[in-house]
Amino acid sequence: MMNRLLVFLMLGAAFMLVVSAIDQDANEDVNMKRGLPCKCDGDKHMSGTFWMFGCPPGWHSCVVANAFCCKQ
C-alpha cells in the first residue's frame, strides 16, 4: 500500500513539473512584451506595441494620433 502511494506521489510531482514548464514557455513572449500589438504609421502589419501608460524608456511613439503605440 505504501509503495503505491509513493508511486502515485512521484507521478503527480513529475506531472506538475511538466505542466509548469509548458506553461512558462507558452507565456514567455507575453511576459517579455507586456503589451498588445498595434499598427505603426506607414506599416502594413502590427509592428508596434500598445503600452497602457505610455512608451517605456528606450521606446518611441510610432503613431501620430496615439502616443501609446510604441516601437523599440
Swiss-Prot record:
SUPFAM superfamilies in the record: Defensin-like
Propeptide intervals in chain numbering: 22-32
Presence of keyword Transcription regulation: no
Subcellular location: Secreted; Nematocyst
Signal peptide range: 1-21
Disulfide bridge partners, by residue number: 38-69, 40-62, 55-70
Recorded GO CC terms: extracellular region; nematocyst
Listed GO MF terms: toxin activity
Keywords per UniProt: Cleavage on pair of basic residues, Disulfide bond, Nematocyst, Neurotoxin, Secreted, Signal, Toxin
Family the UniProt entry places it in: Belongs to the sea anemone sodium channel inhibitory toxin family. Type I subfamily.
The protein, known as: U-actitoxin-Avd1f
Species assigned in the record: Anemonia viridis (Snakelocks anemone)
